[in-house]
């Protein structure tokens, strides 16, 4: 399971669309998104309610506590909304220690209300927990003792008997309505492969539940079976995180291939860099460097898998090596080319792309005092490792090569020993 945050706009879009599909009832949610590309005149023509109703506007940037931070404006007309957005669009703010520009806003009808409820559903490996409170809103944390929680084991259904403790203290006139609402939202949560869904608050309009503020996360590994249900979904970068040009390039490669190519710069000045085959293995290598006390020296996270073509590996390896060798400072560096034991991927074939990139970057590798550590197993691995061994002599760069007889992460310790001994 990979939990990916989505914007509030998309959370509400999914809930609105699929609440009706699953229950036959309409949730009167209306919202629009505004960013740098939005033509406000066209937006009003497409959504005429924007010019006839009082509105709410707030950033839609994956961070919370917007109300307490003065970033929510209420009871505005559209001209005021446009001014609010213009004054803040692209401006940098700091939230919970993270700084970044505000690029996206959500605009909705202003709904006067007296009641504020809280609903939260979270999934984990054992099932789901559902939390509910009659005291929702911005002070939910101060009223956490009033939150009731139930647990639904994996594979179990949410029956009215199980749900009963959540709504036990509600007035009779709204108890049934909210119980039905929680039932449908939980069904929707599972049907769409949400991993997290929070409404804080939701209220009642004409006796019917109406979500005012919403946060959602989806299991993006379920995208293959939900592409029609999710529609044009966006998984934004976390607030404060902006892709570098190199990361954007690899992301573009990844989008165009059936293989997997991932690359994230963690510390541009780090002295340990990785290029690891396999999603699970890549995490293990990164964790091992951290567990050995050298997380601060880890330059990147990198993973390739799914039998990428040689040219794709070549382009990928060029980027990793360019970042790993940038701005040589006389200190030694290590490049870990690791992986587990492949089942189907031809190790020699994927190594061909890496070897070509290493040859191209010979001068950069030497200038950065790079030492390369290789560990791999799988189909045709002997041929691939032999090529790596001969490459070291050919380009004059030290390369330590190991097969499946060595522990998978042993080269992490060797890399650390190298950079510390040479310090």
From Swiss-Prot:
<dbReference type="InterPro" id="IPR056749">
    <property type="entry name" value="Citrate_synth_N"/>
</dbReference>
<dbReference type="GO" id="GO:0005524">
    <property type="term" value="F:ATP binding"/>
</dbReference>
<dbReference type="GO" id="GO:0140615">
    <property type="term" value="C:ATP-dependent citrate lyase complex"/>
</dbReference>
<comment type="subunit">
    <text>Heterooctamer of 4 alpha and 4 beta chains.</text>
</comment>
<feature type="binding site">
    <location>
        <position position="345"/>
    </location>
    <ligand>
        <name>citrate</name>
    </ligand>
</feature>
<dbReference type="GO" id="GO:0003878">
    <property type="term" value="F:ATP citrate synthase activity"/>
</dbReference>
<dbReference type="GO" id="GO:0005829">
    <property type="term" value="C:cytosol"/>
</dbReference>
<keyword id="KW-0808">Transferase</keyword>
<dbReference type="Pfam" id="PF24948">
    <property type="entry name" value="Citrate_synth_N"/>
</dbReference>
<keyword id="KW-0963">Cytoplasm</keyword>
<keyword id="KW-0443">Lipid metabolism</keyword>
<dbReference type="InterPro" id="IPR016102">
    <property type="entry name" value="Succinyl-CoA_synth-like"/>
</dbReference>
<feature type="binding site">
    <location>
        <position position="343"/>
    </location>
    <ligand>
        <name>citrate</name>
    </ligand>
</feature>
<dbReference type="InterPro" id="IPR032263">
    <property type="entry name" value="Citrate-bd"/>
</dbReference>
<feature type="binding site">
    <location>
        <position position="376"/>
    </location>
    <ligand>
        <name>citrate</name>
    </ligand>
</feature>
<comment type="similarity">
    <text>Belongs to the succinate/malate CoA ligase beta subunit family.</text>
</comment>
<dbReference type="GO" id="GO:0006629">
    <property type="term" value="P:lipid metabolic process"/>
</dbReference>
<keyword id="KW-0067">ATP-binding</keyword>
<dbReference type="GO" id="GO:0006085">
    <property type="term" value="P:acetyl-CoA biosynthetic process"/>
</dbReference>
<protein>
    <recommendedName>
        <fullName>ATP-citrate synthase alpha chain protein 2</fullName>
        <ecNumber>2.3.3.8</ecNumber>
    </recommendedName>
</protein>
<dbReference type="Pfam" id="PF16114">
    <property type="entry name" value="Citrate_bind"/>
</dbReference>
<keyword id="KW-0547">Nucleotide-binding</keyword>
<comment type="function">
    <text>ATP citrate-lyase is the primary enzyme responsible for the synthesis of cytosolic acetyl-CoA, used for the elongation of fatty acids and biosynthesis of isoprenoids, flavonoids and malonated derivatives. May supply substrate to the cytosolic acetyl-CoA carboxylase, which generates the malonyl-CoA used for the synthesis of a multitude of compounds, including very long chain fatty acids and flavonoids. Required for normal growth and development and elongation of C18 fatty acids to C20 to C24 fatty acids in seeds.</text>
</comment>
<keyword id="KW-0444">Lipid biosynthesis</keyword>
<keyword id="KW-0012">Acyltransferase</keyword>
